[in-house]
Amino acid sequence: MATLKTTFAGVSMPNPFMLASAPPTTNCEMVARSFDAGWGGAVLKTMAYDLRMARNVNPRIAAYKVGKSIHGFTNFELGSPKPISKWLEDARWLKERFPEHAVFVSLLHTEGLVEEQWREVTRMFNDAGIDGFELNFSCSHGMAEAGGGAQVGGNEEAIKMVTNWVRSETNLPVMPKLPAMVPNIGSKARAAEEAGADAIATINTLNSIPGIDIYNFVPYPTVDGKSAFSVMSGRAIK
């Protein structure tokens, strides 16, 4: 009998179709519905050790159109505002209900590269029964001003350092997610491999600016008439 069952980085799943870390994996209920609909795995919404900076507003996503056709989306969404304790609970629930499906977590530091924070979170999820780790080294909204997110992905030594911290705390697959807007993404991937990465995820959204409605000069997306630095996804960046 034909089957789509596959193995990725040593993890078995019903098929090779896996939801990326994004709004569709914001909570365990949404992930469960995706599994019921046929998806083989999911990377949970990026989470951070410290939630001080995680406050999303609405609306934060806008469609980029050419004529009436949608070619992409811009957004200024941050990581998950839920605490690690809630994600641990959700991850356990998902693996109990869907033991055959792949569940990866996506980790992001907040303020400063604090070794023990990365190690502690890795140990907690390793013991929660998940299948693997994505290391978000590519988020433009991931505290880049404090040296995080895409700033890590642009620095080979930082990639090696953080990947090694996580690698030393787990035998599960470790998958750094690298940004496209770096001088040499190949050398960044090599740095991750040398630190023990099992796979590489590429790419994240690309830096952009919010659009402007030229008829009323309102930016989009807009909250109370204001917008912010954005990123773009979809067909427009291919």
Where are these regions (language model features)?
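N-terminal capping/small domains of soluble enzymes
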Residues: 1-103, 108-115, 120
